[in-house]
Amino acid sequence: MRSGAQSCGSPASSWAEDALLEAFLVSTLVVAIGEIGDKTQLLALILAARFRRPVPIIFGILFATLFNHALAGLLGGWIRAAVAPDVLRWGLGLSFLAIAAWALKPDKMDEEPVAIGKYGAFAVTFVAFFLAEIGDKTQIATVALAARFDSLVAVVAGTTAGMLIADVPAVFLADRASTRIPFKAIRYVAAALFAAMGVAALAI
């Protein structure tokens, strides 16, 4: 007969599951809020208005984000393994505070990132989103989150889910969404969230 300890999950297993869930939920929340009003959300509005084909646009966003954030997450994991804990703590704290300040600045699309040409909605969206995310605050946040949490899969899944939560409604609402979303208020919420994470990292 199996003992109660064997039949129930061990404390270590429960802790690991909680850590994975925390990494996923925090990553989702941070990126979903930070993405609202970001240039990639504006890009989703532009592509949706241009193509009027939401499904390939959404798949383009999904795969571009997975690819881009997986690379960012790998970098964050390497930083976590290579950097001393005290240096990592200060680096993460200051990074989140810097992203908080960055979140207060409105994004805009200065020019068309990818010419439409003969390419389809999926290809244009994939390339445009991948390029737009390079150096963007959500990519930098993914690096920091992957360095903060010891779970690449949970972080990348969370940041990708956050991107979709913010961008999919924009695809379906197209240009009507941009006039109704309180971007300024949401930027302040995003900045406060990043700042709180920065303070928490420094206080550990």
Language-model segments: what does each one mean?
Residues L131-T142, A195-I204:
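Hydrophobic alpha-helical transmembrane segments in multi-pass integral membrane proteins
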Residues F122-A128, A154-T159:
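Alpha-helical membrane-embedding segments
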Residues A32, I36, L66-F67, A101, ...:
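Hydrophobic/aromatic residues within the transmembrane alpha-helices of Major Facilitator Superfamily
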Residues L25, L29, Y119, A123-V127:
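Alpha-helical membrane-protein architecture signal
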Residues E22, R52-G120, P169-R180, A185, ...:
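Membrane helix-loop-helix hairpins that form the core translocation module of multi-pass transporters
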